[in-house]
Amino acid sequence: MGAKLSSAAVLAGFSGSIYGRLVMRIAAPELTPEQTYKLMSGIVVPRPIAWITTLGPGGKVNLAPFSCYTFVSNTPPMLGVNIGRKAGLRKDTARNMLEHGHFVVNVGNADLLDAIHASAEEHPPEVSEAELLQLDVLPGEAIATPRLAAAPVSLECVLHSVTPFGDTGAEFFVGEVRLFHIRDGLARDGKIDTTLLDPVCRIGGPNYARLGPLITKRTLRQTPKSVMGQDTP
């Protein structure tokens, strides 16, 4: 796990056994930011990847992958992505999102994995990772930010809110989706065929994964989604 955990962090080594297995107890407050990140990123898995395009200096298309990402609302559709800092400074993506107020979340598939990984390398703000990796872009339609032509799914978003978290300057960016771009054949009966999408996900370290065998269970009865104040009593 890189730097060793201090004896203060590991409480009395192994604390005993549960169902015949040893359990390690680690005191979270004693961990360094790097140690915490390595633990959390290996525990919270698998994580989908938001491959985000933003507008950088001079209109250059900045491109970077982020795996602390989810959707937070369905009406209106909203996505959330956590973006940390490097040496206390905002990353290019966060800075561009705050400056322009819009961005595109592209969803890459297994064919694009090498490019997804390479786009995580750090470059000066004026460098376009899309150009560097020879990835074609298409003009945005609802916003000014371009999207990746090769991405099977792209979501044009306007920035909704930014919430700071923790002591290292991490911020949770929420964007409202204004336009969905979905490659023909991926959507069936209003749903995405995940197998055809073939998304990649992030796990701990420089490691990724693809979908394994799908396990289908019986459909459970659920109350339909509704809009607060309109469809609810």
Locate the predicted segments by residue.
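Flexible, acidic active-site loops/lids enriched in D/E/S/T/G that coordinate Mg2+ and/or position polar
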Residues: 9
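Cationic, low-complexity basic patches in intrinsically disordered or flexible, solvent-exposed regions
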Residues: 5
